[in-house]
Amino acid sequence: MGSQSPNTDMRKINRSAMLRLVAKHGQISRNKLCEYMGLTGAGISRISRDLIDTGMLLETAQEGVSKGAGRRGSDLSLNPDGAYVLGITITANRKSVTLVNCTQQVLGQWDFDAMDVANPEKAIQSFCDVAHSLIEESGIDRNKLLGAGVGLATTEKLGENGYVTSPILGWNNVPVKSLFEAALGLPFIIEARALAMLRAEVWAEKVDNAEGTILINNGVGMGAAAYFDGRFIPTGVAGLGNISHLSLPDSAVLCRCGRTGCLEYSGTGAAVLADVNGWPPNKLPVFSELSGDLHNLVQ
């Protein structure tokens, strides 16, 4: 079977670029799209017409008097009912499922007050059951549900095909991606939570690409991700996963890695729990056993 033509590929690239620009600006004129995309007015009109016909974009007449004898200009915006996605968070102290539309409006959300994730297959099925309920209760067109993203707590590099090892969750080489996709019939993207958070910061243009940025997510444990020269460096790559194992010289707290003083146990939520509960520094529980204690503490 032959590959797609270059023209087809270019149309996909241009449609994707237009959707990103419209999403970033909220509402934007065709003239601005010509300026940003470097295309002619006719080219912009063809691409926008395709996206309007598929229900992804809405066209709104600009306010004010039109210039000259031509028709009044129009702005383009995302159609709130054009597409939907699911977002799933799995950390020691936060486990939730959220359904949003393409304009970032939350249509439904469920937070698990306390969930035992010791059995990953059972836990993932619980997330999927809630996702099915949110989809049904929202009344959305299931065919417009594009996919889902999972942000989970880990300091390890994610394995190929969405396999996850997470000391914080107590998971070892779990096929998270395939389990979710089989249960929901949707494409999934699996990310370390620190990287997912950094992507959101970059998308919102809160990160200066020229300077570079390292994001450190400090919860029960500690995760990190970086953005340099237009590239994301995920948790577990180039030593980023080891930030949590930088050692405090005056700390006697024993880390799961066998060393003492690691930030993972001496500078995170685990340290707060240890202090509140009076646990000895050489007998801290593993992370996967801490979520219930943390939930009770923050109530």
Where are each of the predicted segments found?
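Gly/Thr-rich phosphate-binding beta-strand-loop-beta motif of the actin/hexokinase/Hsp70
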Residues: 70-109, 214-230
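Extreme N-terminal segment that seeds HTH/winged-HTH DNA-binding domains in transcriptional regulators
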Residues: 1-36
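Conserved phosphate-binding catalytic cores of ATP/NTP-utilizing and phosphoryl-transfer enzymes
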Residues: 59-85, 188-213
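Glycine-rich phosphate-binding loop and adjoining helix at the ATP-binding site
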Residues: 106-212
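Glycine-centered, phosphate/nucleic-acid-interacting loop/turn motifs that mediate DNA/RNA or nucleotide
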Residues: 26, 55-56, 154
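A mobile "lid/hinge" subdomain adjacent to the ATP/sugar-phosphate binding pocket shared
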Residues: 152, 253, 259-299
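Basic amphipathic alpha-helical segments that dock to polyanions
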Residues: 22, 33, 44-58
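Glycine-rich phosphate-binding loop of actin/hexokinase-like ATP-binding domains
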Residues: 210-266
